[in-house]
């Protein structure tokens, strides 16, 4: 993997900097590194592809070295370099695709394609290593089963989940009370509702709670908490739990009371925030517990009182809610990230070449399925293919 990254980094720099008119002295170190790459690769043969519709390709290396000059790089010099660069870029691209479409239930962190296994050989260690990539650093740590520290701006830690729980229900579905939620990506939307606006609740207050367990521990998280659940602020028709009928939800939004958010790790409370909105920070957690109340307004103007009558029919439904967004966090596991393209790159290559479903990843790289059942085998394989995708992204946009 180090060699593949070094090849890609060298080729990217060469493609960007070996251009007509450039002073040789400005790129002499790069050309020396480029020539070392050629010397190491010359005389070797590789084969890529041969899985799904990814074509089998054979690669052989026999390239001349780039010379020295006292002046600027001319057109002939650049053209010679470009021919070599283009071949190497095509090779690296195919090695990356070959690696991204393979998986293994055992030791999935290690190279799976024959081409990358060959590049891991001792004779290729002469290619200059550049381990400045965070993905490469973490791949090396994970490969040695040491502590890793992936940073994600918006980790897709929540599997998609959208449902409701009714604490009060009738066959007619005309006086309901309960909770509905939508968890997905890095966001939680939860709403508590009471058709009767807590008219018969103790002290005219309804209590709601929503608990979300994460598939992996997050640390040093910056979070936005808002006193509203925008996703549940408009009318909708909802299928009943048994699928036998539908019921009407017509929310009127109230501000939640006594809001509390707790971040827990292994059942122990790490951080607690009460009635605090905007930006908050959670140090270390694997569970989020949200609790809030719906309080019937003690004083109402006639127009508000008309929305919340003391008896049925209840045409408007009192609703309170919260939105929680994880803006950034550190996770030692590999996760899809809204600010990165690794999952999209891997998935698109596997779809483009009709790669058959293997023993590790779900069909279509379904992220909800993958993160819901996030086994060590899946994590190892995901770590490897995301690392390769990050290498490929340097050369192929």
UniProtKB/Swiss-Prot annotation:
Residues 62-73 are annotated as: Interaction with the inner capsid protein VP2. GO terms for cellular component: viral envelope; viral intermediate capsid. GO terms for molecular function: host cell surface receptor binding; metal ion binding; structural molecule activity. Zn(2+) binds at residue 153. It holds the Pfam family Rota_Capsid_VP6. InterPro entries: Capsid_hemagglutn (IPR008980), Rotavirus_A/C_VP6 (IPR001385), Virus_capsid_a-hlx_vir (IPR008935). Belongs to the rotavirus VP6 family. The VP6 trimer contains a zinc ion located at the center of the molecule. The zinc ion is not essential for either trimerization or transcription activity of the DLP. Zinc-depleted VP6 has an increased sensitivity to proteases. This is Intermediate capsid protein VP6. It comes from Rotavirus A (strain RVA/Human/Japan/S2/1980/G2P1B[4]) (RV-A). The lineage of its organism: Viruses, Riboviria, Orthornavirae, Duplornaviricota, Resentoviricetes.
């Amino acid at each position: 993997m180090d060699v593949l990254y070094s090849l890609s980094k060298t080729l990217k720099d060469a493609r960007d900097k070996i251009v007509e008119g450039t002073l040789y002295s400005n790129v002499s170190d790069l050309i020396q590194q480029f020539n070392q790459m050629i010397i190491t690769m010359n005389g070797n043969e590789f084969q890529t592809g041969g899985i799904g519709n990814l074509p089998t390709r054979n690669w052989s290396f026999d390239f001349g070295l780039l010379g020295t000059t006292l002046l600027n790089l001319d057109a002939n010099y650049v053209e010679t370099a470009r021919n070599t660069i283009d071949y190497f870029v095509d090779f690296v691209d195919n090695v990356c695709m070959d690696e991204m479409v393979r998986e293994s239930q055992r030791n999935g962190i290690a190279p799976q394609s024959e081409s990358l296994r060959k590049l891991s050989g001792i004779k290729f260690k002469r290619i200059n290593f550049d381990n400045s990539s965070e993905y490469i650093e973490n791949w090396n740590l994970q490969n040695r089963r040491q502590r890793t520290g992936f940073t994600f701006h918006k980790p897709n830690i929540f599997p998609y989940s959208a449902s409701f729980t009714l604490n009060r229900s009738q066959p007619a579905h005309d006086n309901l009370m309960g909770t509905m939620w939508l968890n997905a990506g890095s966001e939680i939307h939860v709403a508590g509702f009471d058709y009767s606006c807590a008219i018969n609740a103790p002290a005219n207050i309804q209590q709601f709670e929503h608990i979300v367990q994460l598939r992996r521990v997050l640390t040093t998280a910056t979070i936005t908490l808002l006193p509203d659940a925008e996703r549940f602020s408009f009318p909708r028709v909802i299928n009943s739990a048994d699928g036998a009928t539908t019921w009407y939800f017509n929310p009127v939004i109230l501000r939640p009371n006594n809001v509390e958010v707790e971040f827990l790790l292994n059942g122990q409370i790490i951080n607690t925030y009460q009635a605090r909105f905007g930006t908050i920070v959670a140090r270390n957690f694997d569970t989020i517990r949200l609790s809030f109340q719906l309080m019937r307004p003690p004083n109402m103007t006639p127009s508000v009182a008309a929305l919340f009558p003391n008896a049925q029919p209840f045409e408007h439904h009192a609703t309170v809610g919260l939105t929680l967004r994880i803006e950034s966090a550190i996770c030692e596991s590999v996760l899809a990230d809204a600010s990165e393209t690794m999952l999209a790159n891997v998935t698109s290559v596997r779809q483009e070449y009709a790669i058959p479903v293997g023993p590790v990843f779900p069909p279509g790289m379904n992220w909800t399925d993958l993160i819901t059942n996030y086994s060590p085998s899946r994590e190892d394989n995901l770590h490897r293919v995301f690392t390769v995708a990050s290498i490929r992204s340097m050369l192929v946009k």
